[in-house]
Amino acid sequence: MSMTAQKALQRIVEHREILQDEMVQLMRQIMNSEVSGIMVAAILAGLRVKKETVGEIAGAATVMREFSRKVNVQDRTHLVDIVGTGGDGWHTFNISTCAMFVAAAAGAKVAKHGNRSVSSKSGSADVLEALGASIELQPLEVAEAIGCIGVGFMFAPIHHPVMQVVSPVRREMGVRTIFNILGPLTNPADAPNILMGVFDPDLVGIQVHVLHKLGAERALVVCGRDGMDELSLGTTTLVGELRGGRVCEYEVSPEDYGMAVSPISNLRVESSAESREMLLNVLAGKPGPALDVVALNAGAALYVAGVAQDIGHGVALAREVIFNGRARNILNQYVAFTRRPRNV
């Protein structure tokens, strides 16, 4: 039986689940502009109140992947995305963006998917522009950057143009919806390994099972007990790990990796310019909480990418490439690559 918007809404208001294949049908209709804005808003709000299930999220993400402009990375060995949902409210500098250059310098291939700021002071796209990089790379150029340098940034509006269909509704609603957690699940390069930060501990188990359904090989989904959508220095971090087809959950703390506990306030910024300054200080090897949190998250990325044996080994590799200048060199190469003359 086909799933219509009306049937879906009826199911939702009765607090009944939409099955994954039904969600695929529904999302295709939404993305093809076959559902009115009023119905889209009602469905999104209803899902939020009911709480989205693993199958519903996986079905929606499947369709977003179908409609995306793909990045074809030839050598997928150690290919990883480092991404967060955002929305944690802490306004830290761009930790995952800094970590991508560190992870690439240590041997991973990073296909980072991101956007401008929505709720933070500086989104990944914003800080990359502040660093002098162009964020307007087309899919072939991103693939070339990953192949040549080991890192590429995929600006969400370029790779998900169909999102314009729901943008007016989301903007007018002004509340979190399923789309806030779909972005990190829809990497256009289909990176088989992923380090994902989420803003809510309840999402750790959900998102790691969604990634399993979507065919990820390895994944770490993390949320600090302080609500940070990264591995946190301020407290323990809840981790959901997918490896070998199995999912497990555990906690890690900064002390596990020889790091001092440090309040998140030490990582806060007020603008992209401040985030840029903190990021460059890290890549220059300036000791402190910012360097520690980048090493911790880059270390986790190196582990999930299969470069490091465990997170601790990854942290050691991350520190090495920060202090020997290789991570800063990767940043410089990437900025130069994005600014080169392009054929029109």
From Swiss-Prot:
GO molecular function: anthranilate phosphoribosyltransferase activity; magnesium ion binding
Annotated anthranilate 2 binding sites: R170
Residues noted as binding Mg(2+) 1 in the record, renumbered to the chain: S96, E230
Pathway in which this enzyme or protein is active: Amino-acid biosynthesis; L-tryptophan biosynthesis; L-tryptophan from chorismate: step 2/5
Residue sites binding anthranilate 1 per the record: G84, N115
Textual note on the cofactor: Binds 2 magnesium ions per monomer.
Quaternary data: Homodimer.
Protein name listed in UniProt: Anthranilate phosphoribosyltransferase
Biological role stated in the UniProt entry: Catalyzes the transfer of the phosphoribosyl group of 5-phosphorylribose-1-pyrophosphate (PRPP) to anthranilate to yield N-(5'-phosphoribosyl)-anthranilate (PRA).
Catalytic reaction equation(s): N-(5-phospho-beta-D-ribosyl)anthranilate + diphosphate = 5-phospho-alpha-D-ribose 1-diphosphate + anthranilate
Residues bound to Mg(2+) 2: D229, E230
Cofactor(s) needed for function: Mg(2+)
Name of encoding gene: trpD
Residues of the signal peptide: none
UniProt xrefs under NCBIfam families: trpD (TIGR01245)
EC number assigned by the record: 2.4.2.18
Family: Belongs to the anthranilate phosphoribosyltransferase family.
Residues given in the record as 5-phospho-alpha-D-ribose 1-diphosphate binding sites: 84, 87-88, 92, 94-97, 112-120, 124
